[in-house]
Amino acid sequence: MKMANHPRPGDIIQESLDELNVSLREFARAMEIAPSTASRLLTGKAALTPEMAIKLSVVIGSSPQMWLNLQNAWSLAEAEKTVDVSRLRRLVTQ
């Protein structure tokens, strides 16, 4: 089963920053993280953690659960593109 395209969390964060007219440095400062960490988050090189989700809920809005759901949906969609399950078989009772 092919999943729909899910937005990368970093893209959603970037859209919010653009709407707020906030720079990467301002965002990093508000989140109390290094600018390099903020950059990795926005580019998808770092996954959104529960700690980041809590901070995002305060700094940008929405719930921590929404941010984690977004990350999980995107991560699962990406994994489905690369994980080869063709040789796997379901375990059954005998």
Swiss-Prot record:
The keyword Repeat does not apply. It holds the Pfam family HTH_3. PROSITE patterns: HTH_CROC1. Residues 13-67 form the HTH cro/C1-type domain. It comes from the Bacteria. GO terms for molecular function: DNA binding. Keywords: DNA-binding, Transcription, Transcription regulation. InterPro entries: Cro/C1-type_HTH, Lambda_DNA-bd_dom_sf, Toxin_antidote_HigA. Residues 24-43 bind DNA. The keyword NAD does not apply. Belongs to the VapA/VapI family. This is Uncharacterized HTH-type transcriptional regulator YddM. It comes from Escherichia coli O6:H1 (strain CFT073 / ATCC 700928 / UPEC). The lineage of its organism: Bacteria, Pseudomonadati, Pseudomonadota, Gammaproteobacteria, Enterobacterales. The gene is yddM.
